[in-house]
């Protein structure tokens, strides 16, 4: 038996089995990106929709950096922001329209309404996830206009 035949009969089937095994193992476990998406959406729901600091803080890293200029850093900054929302906008809800993940970042495209007659706001929230915890947040907020120059909508 020559080297090519040995390869064909032994090495190639073993390599194929290894590739299939790795693919099956990967399919059985959620990817890190999917896990990060879950963490960000559950954190968002607890903090913004339910306004539940105790639930939201379970997802918070020990050092939470905030880039929204109206919110302070850290757990106490988040607590104060949730208290503000609960007091000032108790009916505010965010409907997550899209979730995008890349590396350690998760982006939420959200339609936020306050339970009044206004069309709400379009919000893009960006969360950085580290070791399964939310450690950083950015956002961009835009009012949804009553009339637009096109019929495409914001969502």
Which positions does each model-derived feature cover?
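C-terminal and inter-domain tail/linker signature
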Residues: 26-155
């Amino acid at each position: 038996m020559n080297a090519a035949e040995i390869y064909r009969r032994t090495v190639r089937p073993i390599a194929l089995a290894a590739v299939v095994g790795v693919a099956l193992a990967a399919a059985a476990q959620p990817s890190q990106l999917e896990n990060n998406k879950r963490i960000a959406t559950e954190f968002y729901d607890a903090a913004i929709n339910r306004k539940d600091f105790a639930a939201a803080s379970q997802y918070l890293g020990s050092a939470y950096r905030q880039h929204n200029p109206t919110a302070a850093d850290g757990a106490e900054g988040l607590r104060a922001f949730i208290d503000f929302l609960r007091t000032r906008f108790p009916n505010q809800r965010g409907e997550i329209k899209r979730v995008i993940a890349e590396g350690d970042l998760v982006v939420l495209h959200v339609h936020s309404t306050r339970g009044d007659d206004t069309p709400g706001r379009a919000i893009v929230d960006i969360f950085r996830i580290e070791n399964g915890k939310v450690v950083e947040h950015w956002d961009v907020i835009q009012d949804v206009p009553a009339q637009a120059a096109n019929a495409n909508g914001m969502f």
